[in-house]
Amino acid sequence: MAEGKKVILKIKRQASTKDAARWEEFALHWRPSMNIIICLRDIAENPVTSEGQQTTPVSYDSNCLEEVCGSCAMLINGKARMACSALVDQLEQPVRIEPMSKFPVVRDLSVDRQFMFESLKRVKAWIPIDGTYNLGEGPRVAPEVQEKAYPLSRCITCGNCLEVCPQVNDHNNFMGAAIFSQVRLFNMHPTGAMHAKDRIQAVMGRGGIEDCANAQNCVKACPKEIPLTESLAEINRQAWKQALLGWLVG
């Protein structure tokens, strides 16, 4: 794009989940290195459609602007991605922007990801430290374990993997690849391993690992390139092992 060009955005808007959605088009002055967040900020400063109609600023979630917080995930030209790293010069115009479809809409592009956080609580996705604060340094972790764990720790809970997963729908409570990857991460930690059986038991229930259909869309959509399919396979293996041992032991 050259100087003087316009950026055309078509944004899907709605006041809440219960309200009907509508589309509004905006024409913005192009600037070098514009991303979608910059476009949304420009609209907020001057909320006027391309037809000259006064409207309200578009509601959206954003924080870090460097693909770390995970809050700005949305559908951009039909693809689940982070708005802060979506450069206008690399997008086909008009740019169509929609809220993610697998989460309830709060307003406009802002969605409620509470389902993900409830799933993380369900699988105890944390390291228990109560009573260990006075035990000195934590347990040592082998370098090879660190190398496997670090990519898993990069999850930003953006929800992209749930958005592209066909198993996450109105008829299924599938928790999504990010959750199982966190189970794998915390089960690898020496302290977290104390609750490994509880986590695996949690993913063996409704919406758990058995509901994965191996579509593998998740690993392609992950902005942090987390090996989600490896995590799904590993958690599936751990679940089968725990189930068989439980059956044999009785």
Where are these regions (language model features)?
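Beta-strand-dominated extracellular/periplasmic modules and repeats
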Residues: 8, 23, 46-48
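Short structural boundary motif marking the start of a folded domain
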Residues: 3-9
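Glycine-rich phosphate/adenylate-binding loop and adjacent beta-alpha elements
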Residues: 76-98
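Ferredoxin-type iron-sulfur electron-transfer modules in oxidoreductases and energy-metabolism complexes
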Residues: 34-56, 95-250
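Short, contiguous acidic and Ser/Thr-rich linear segments
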Residues: 22-35
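Short N-terminal binding/cap micro-motifs at the start of the first secondary-structure element
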Residues: 16-21
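Serine/threonine-rich, repeat-prone extracellular segments and beta-strand-based repeat modules
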Residues: 62-66
